[in-house]
């Protein structure tokens, strides 16, 4: 049982990785909210669909609201990509997926004036035999653009924890391998000792031990 308890977390991790590879899974990951001036910035917008909702007509609208201003349309997907006339014209790039579950866009050459609130609206009309339901989802991305990249304390801590976990798993696997090797070696030594003891018995004793005594 202790060995099972030690192996169960690793088996669970391997099972999750196997499922993720064999069966694509949609995960609604939030977007980054900080960008550096002059670099590209991906505005992530993911709207997952259930398996039975594959057939759908999807319309995507991206809006931008500057600080103290109003929303205005900067990008639209309706039967194809369409970049509308705006201050972002020529700097927006479609970064979504073919199934339109990921409808992200990338802002090229980010400037300080690009700080503000970005809104991603995803409208879907599902095609069923009996009815055609309409669903709309909204994602808000408050973006802050800085002149230089600042050190993110959270990312540093996460990176340190990742390395610690990696070292721990490596040591754990090494200990398990040594334990299994010693266990197999002891089993082989015991088998060899039993075989040696059997060979050391005189042949007469072997015959007597093999033939039952009749009264």
From Swiss-Prot:
Q: Cite the ranges annotated as topological domain Extracellular.
A: 23-156
Where would one find coiled-coil regions in this protein? Answer: none
PTM summary from the entry reads: Intramolecular disulfide bonds favor the voltage-gated sodium channel oligomeric complex assembly.
* Intrachain S-S bonds: 26-48, 45-120
Task: Tell me the compartments it is located in.
Answer: Cell membrane
What does the record give under GO molecular function? Answer: sodium channel inhibitor activity; sodium channel regulator activity; transmembrane transporter binding; voltage-gated sodium channel activity involved in cardiac muscle cell action potential
Q: GO cellular component terms? A: cytosol; intracellular membrane-bounded organelle; plasma membrane; voltage-gated sodium channel complex; Z disc
Task: Tell me which residues make up the Ig-like C2-type domain.
Answer: 32-154
Query: So which stretches are on the Cytoplasmic side?
Result: 179-215
Which residue windows are transmembrane per the record?
157-178
Q: How does it sit in the membrane?
A: Single-pass type I membrane protein
Which residues get glycosylated? 95, 109, 113, 121
* Superkingdom of the source species: Eukaryota
| Signal sequence segment | 1-22
An example GO biological process term is: positive regulation of heart rate
Q: Which InterPro entries match?
A: Ig-like_dom, Ig-like_dom_sf, Ig-like_fold, Ig_sub, Ig_V-set, Na_channel_b1/b3
| Keyword terms of this UniProt record | Cell membrane, Disulfide bond, Glycoprotein, Immunoglobulin domain, Ion channel, Ion transport, Membrane, Signal, Sodium, Sodium channel, Sodium transport, Transmembrane, Transmembrane helix, Transport, Voltage-gated channel
Subunit structure, as described in the record: A voltage-gated sodium (Nav) channel consists of an ion-conducting pore-forming alpha subunit functional on its own that is regulated by one or more beta subunits. Forms homodimers and homotrimers. SCN3B is non-covalently associated with alpha subunits and induces the formation of alpha subunit oligomers, including trimers. Interacts with SCN5A/Nav1.5; regulatory subunit of SCN5A/Nav1.5. Interacts with SCN7A/Nav2.1; probable regulatory subunit of SCN7A/Nav2.1. Interacts with SCN10A; regulatory subunit of SCN10A/Nav1.8.
Tell me its family: Belongs to the sodium channel auxiliary subunit SCN3B (TC 8.A.17) family.
Please name the PANTHER family in this protein's record: SODIUM CHANNEL SUBUNIT BETA-1 AND 3 (PTHR10546), SODIUM CHANNEL SUBUNIT BETA-3 (PTHR10546:SF1)
Q: What's this protein's function?
A: Regulatory subunit of multiple voltage-gated sodium (Nav) channels directly mediating the depolarization of excitable membranes. Navs, also called VGSCs (voltage-gated sodium channels) or VDSCs (voltage-dependent sodium channels), operate by switching between closed and open conformations depending on the voltage difference across the membrane. In the open conformation they allow Na(+) ions to selectively pass through the pore, along their electrochemical gradient.
This one is known as Sodium channel regulatory subunit beta-3
Species of the source:
Bos taurus (Bovine)
Q: Please state the gene responsible for encoding this protein.
A: SCN3B
């Amino acid at each position: 049982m202790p060995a099972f308890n030690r192996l169960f977390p690793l088996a669970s991790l391997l099972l999750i990785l196997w499922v993720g590879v064999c069966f694509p899974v949609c995960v609604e990951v939030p977007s980054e909210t900080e960008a550096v001036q002059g670099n590209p910035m991906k505005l992530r917008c993911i709207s997952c669909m259930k398996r039975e909702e594959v057939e759908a007509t999807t319309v995507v609208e991206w809006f931008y609201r500057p600080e103290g201003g109003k929303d205005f349309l900067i990008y639209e997907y309706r039967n194809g990509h369409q970049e509308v006339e705006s201050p972002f014209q020529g700097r927006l790039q479609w970064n979504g997926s073919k199934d339109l579950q990921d409808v992200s866009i990338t802002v090229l050459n980010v400037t300080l004036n690009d700080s503000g609130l970005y809104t991603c609206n995803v409208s879907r009309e599902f095609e069923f035999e009996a009815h055609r339901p309409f669903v709309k989802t909204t994602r808000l991305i408050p973006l802050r653009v800085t002149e230089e990249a600042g050190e993110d304390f959270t990312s540093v801590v996460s990176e340190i924890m990742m390395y610690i976990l990696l070292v721990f798993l490596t040591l754990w696997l090494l200990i398990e391998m040594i334990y299994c090797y010693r266990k197999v070696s002891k089993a082989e030594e015991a088998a060899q000792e039993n075989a040696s003891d059997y060979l050391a018995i005189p042949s007469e004793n072997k015959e007597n031990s093999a033939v039952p005594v009749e009264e």
